[in-house]
C-alpha cells in the first residue's frame, strides 16, 4: 500500500519511500527495544538456545506474556523459503521438552521467582516477524487453532514504522487434521490450546450470547477492531491492545 506526505494546503502529494532493513538484527533490536509497545510482552532474553529433537535451536527473542502467563518465542526472518508451520511447531516442541530451562532463564534475566506451576504452557506461542511473507506462508497459518502468528514490519523514509499482523481469513479447519503427518505438530497439539470465540460462547447462556452478539457488532462497526479469544475471556483489540472506552 503506497503512502504519501501532503503539504499544508493538501494539494501536492509526495510518496513516502520504503527503506528496507538490511539485516534481521536491525529488526530484532527495534522490536526488543519496543516489545511492550508493539506486542504487549515482557522481554526475557536474546539468542536463547535450546535442544530440539534433531538439533539445537536458537530463539531470537524470548518473551513472556504476563496476561496469559505464557512464554512467547519470536523469530525474525529475511529468508522466505521456510515453512512457518514446521518451524513454529519445532520451537514449541522444544519449549515443552525443556520447560525447566525457560523457568531458569526467566528467573535469572528478570530477577523474579517464577514457578513452573505458575506458567500456563497451554498458551505458549510463536511469532514470526518479517518485512514480507509469501502468499503460501500466509495461507499456511489459516487454521483456527494455530499457535503461530505472522507480523510484517516496514520502515519508511519519514521515520515511520508500520507493524501489522497477518490475519487469518475465516479459518475453520483445525491443525489437528494434519497432526498425524508431523510428530511435532501432534505432540504440541496435545498440550498447547488455541481458543476461539465460539469456544467461549459455548459456555454461556443463549440470552447472554444474544447480548454479546449485539455489542460485538457495534464494536466491530468502529473499524480496525480484532477479536482475540483467550483461555478466560474474549477481548476486542486495537493494534494489539485490548479495547477500552476512555
Predicted regions and their residues:
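Charged, terminal alpha-helix-loop-beta segments
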Residues: 1-246
